[in-house]
């Protein structure tokens, strides 16, 4: 019985790893134009400070990822992740993916 349980959980674990590897992630999606503009503004506001640039870009990436799950998280979710907002606003429909 222990051997069969070990085999079962090994197969279950391998299935999980394969599905996780094959799953489409936010980083795999093309960046919409509005997100590219937000990145440019963040870099412009950092004024050449590499630490500030890194923080700003990480903040944008995290907000984009979180907006995929909850479109009402921040008011700019429609701009950061227009392809995943559950209720399609006019702004979201006009944005390019």
Curated annotation (Swiss-Prot):
Contains 3 disulfide bonds. GO terms for molecular function: toxin activity. Expressed by the venom gland. It comes from the Eukaryota. It is found in: Secreted. Keywords: Disulfide bond, Secreted, Signal, Toxin. Its main location: secreted. Belongs to the scoloptoxin-10 family. This is U-scoloptoxin(10)-Sa2a.
């Amino acid at each position: 019985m222990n051997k069969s349980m070990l085999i079962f959980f090994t197969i279950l674990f391998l299935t999980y790893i394969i599905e996780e590897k094959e799953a489409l992630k936010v980083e795999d999606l093309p960046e919409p134009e509005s997100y590219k503009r937000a990145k440019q503004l963040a870099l412009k506001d950092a004024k050449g400070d590499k630490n500030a640039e890194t923080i700003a870009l990480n903040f944008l990436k995290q907000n984009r990822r979180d907006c995929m799950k909850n479109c009402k998280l921040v008011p700019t979710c429609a701009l950061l992740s227009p392809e995943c907002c559950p209720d399609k606003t006019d702004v979201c429909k006009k944005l390019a993916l």
